[in-house]
Amino acid sequence: YNHRARKFGAEVSGNTIDAINFYKDWFGDKNEKCIIAGDFNNSIIWDKKGNDNNFDNINNHLMSLGFASNYHKLRGEIFGKESSPTFFHTKKEHKKYHIDYIYSKNLNPLELKIGPYSEWITFSDHSPLIMDLD
């Protein structure tokens, strides 16, 4: 999701909701196992009224397809109040956000870890999410 999507054509928005709708046939029906993971470049903290690409809308849409955010499911944290950041803007530790997610359906996640800033900042402004499944 970002403004750079326009280079692929005027009809390409780069919005996560549009990508989910485009690929939803790949996700299978509600009984199939599936994982959607990566940098969503979005958080409920930036939601603005009336914006279709609000993260709350994205999360609700994924939930309607049978997906759940494994971080929030396992840690019992609410969106926008995450205790572990996944992104450090301009690689600064104090500019931290949670914008990377692992959503799954019909899987049993056991544990989800986020790589520590100190070990990963050399490689990326994002920390990896590592999930163990049953």
Predicted regions and their residues:
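Active-site regions of metal-assisted phosphoester/phosphodiester hydrolases
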Residues: 1-134
